[in-house]
From Swiss-Prot:
One of its GO terms (biological process) is symbiont-mediated suppression of host mRNA processing. The keyword Secreted does not apply. Belongs to the influenza A viruses NS1 family. InterPro entries: NS1, NS1A, NS1A_effect_dom-like_sf, uS15_NS1_RNA-bd_sf. It comes from Influenza A virus (strain A/Chicken/Scotland/1959 H5N1). GO terms for cellular component: host cell cytoplasm; host cell nucleus. This is Non-structural protein 1.
């Protein structure tokens, strides 16, 4: 096993522990707590994949961080912080919408890279909007936290979420996954639109009908993909 993979996991475990202690003091805001929950799932998945104990890794990560801090001057820390672009956390969904359980009458699931796409194929002839919570850096989507598809009545009928065991994805991965979800929902004569915020930062554009600028060939490909897997 690569040593960098192990040490990265150890540091992530310790930093999560620090953030959890911060949250336990009721100091974290909603985006902070949301990321904390999802990072916990990710760490569990990585720990299982690597065969590493989280508690042991946390202790090792503490030693690594302490060693770095001992060598770090205040001036170097200021320069490092100034050189890193700041990311922003954007929310289409409330915490209730993100944490709500939902069920599928005709479940369909597809994995695209490090993203899991789920949808209810029993949904037909509905107006659906895609909402997402995600981080943005340099005016481009950086990390998808969660995307869900809602009917006008507020029911959840689809979802795109990162796989805890496969962290890391690009904005192109997210756009491709959205294309798959749209293709699957439209196959049953649903009308799908994407939130203006998501259009703006994923595609850097927006359409009045809420449709992202998917090329016709890509849309046909997405529809065929869903059809072949039914």
């Amino acid at each position: 096993m690569d040593s960098n993979t192990v040490s990265s996991f150890q540091v992530d475990c310790f930093l999560w522990h620090v953030r959890k202690r911060f949250a336990d003091q009721e100091l974290g805001d909603a985006p902070f707590l949301d990321r904390l929950r999802r990072d916990q799932k990710s760490l569990r998945g990585r720990g299982s994949t690597l065969g590493l104990d989280i508690e042991t890794a946390t202790r090792a990560g503490k030693q690594i961080v302490e060693r770095i801090l001992e060598e770090e001057s205040d001036e170097a820390l200021k320069m490092t912080i100034a050189s890193v672009p700041a990311s922003r956390y954007l929310t289409d969904m409330t915490l209730e919408e993100m944490s709500r359980d939902w069920f599928m009458l005709m479940p369909k699931q597809k994995v695209a890279g490090s993203l899991c796409i789920r949808m209810d194929q029993a949904i037909m002839d509905k107006n659906i909007i895609l909402k997402a919570n995600f981080s943005v850096i340099s005016d481009r989507l950086e990390t998808l936290i969660l995307l869900r598809a809602f009917t006008e009545e507020g029911a959840i009928v689809g979802e795109i979420s990162p796989l805890p065991s496969l962290p890391g994805h690009t904005d192109e991965d997210v756009k491709n996954a959205i294309g798959v979800l749209i293709g699957g929902l439209e196959w049953n004569d649903n009308t799908v639109r994407v939130s203006e915020t998501l259009q703006r930062f994923a595609w850097r554009s927006s359409n009045e009908d809420g449709r992202p600028p998917l090329p016709p060939k890509q849309k046909r490909k997405m529809a065929r993909t869903i059809e072949s897997e039914v």
